[in-house]
């Protein structure tokens, strides 16, 4: 009898240890990110992220290759044209617009889209309704820029323009270092990007109309870091669907940015 009790205690301790190990996979919890602000002495122009900016999401798993995306965003960028390394800003992708395009079948893609939004707790499921404050809290995937380096040019005014239709364009490549917040958990992430500044013909280098930001390589988000897992319509963990992770649903998502930001007066 004593031996049985001892075994049970040891098993219980082991189980707790496993749970603790799983818990440590979670990234630090956060409801928001600290503002991404430029240095006080920097001379910057503000750009507003165009509402139609988008992301593409690629999730290859052994049994299913999920393809998805978002098509709404918000945020701002503050750009110092003569010292691009001083650029700061925040981009927020609207996860309520996330849609999958895995199957090429409207009904199947609609169902999969519903599941994805439920896992992220940004929309009600087929059964059940999430509290509005939970959906509002999780609505955006947020990336805040903390530093910029590996610039192909640090001074935009010294970059020779090229032609793109009627526009003149000055392009630089860079690596941004920042924080990524998804589903209440934040991680540090880098983004390798190409930034193209568009001008009316003959316009000064510090007077662009808008800029675009496109990923050179995807930014990876790991589901476990952000506590993204199977959930029902009430936000409860759907343990019966855990076998999908790593088989039909990849354990990570590769995110590609396609942003436009318009110069502000």
Residue ranges and their predicted role:
Residues 1-16:
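Sec-dependent bacterial lipoprotein signal peptides
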């Amino acid at each position: 009898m004593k031996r049985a009790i001892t075994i049970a205690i040891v098993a219980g301790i082991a189980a707790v240890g496993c749970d603790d190990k799983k818990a440590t996979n979670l990234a630090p919890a956060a409801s928001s990110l600290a503002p991404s602000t430029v240095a006080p002495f920097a001379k910057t122009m503000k750009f507003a992220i165009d509402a139609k900016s988008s992301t593409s999401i690629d999730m290859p798993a052994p049994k299913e290759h999920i393809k998805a995306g978002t098509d709404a965003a918000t945020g701002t960028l503050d750009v110092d044209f003569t010292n691009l390394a001083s650029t700061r800003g925040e981009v927020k992708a609207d996860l309520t617009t996330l849609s999958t395009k895995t199957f090429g079948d409207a009904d199947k893609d609609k169902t999969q889209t519903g599941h994805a939004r439920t896992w992220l707790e940004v929309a009600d499921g087929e059964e059940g309704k999430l509290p509005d404050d939970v959906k509002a809290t999780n609505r955006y995937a947020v990336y805040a820029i903390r530093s910029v380096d590996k610039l192909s040019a640090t001074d935009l005014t010294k970059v020779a323009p090229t032609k793109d239709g009627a526009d003149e364009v000055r392009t630089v490549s860079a690596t941004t270092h920042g924080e990524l917040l998804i589903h209440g958990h934040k991680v540090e992430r880098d983004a390798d990007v190409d930034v193209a500044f568009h001008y009316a013909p003959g316009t000064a280098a510090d007077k662009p109309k808008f800029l675009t930001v496109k990923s050179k390589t995807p930014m990876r988000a790991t589901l476990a870091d952000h506590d993204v897992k199977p959930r029902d319509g009430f936000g409860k963990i759907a343990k019966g669907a855990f076998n999908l992770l790593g088989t039909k649903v990849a354990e990570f998502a590769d995110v590609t940015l396609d942003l436009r930001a318009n110069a502000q007066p």
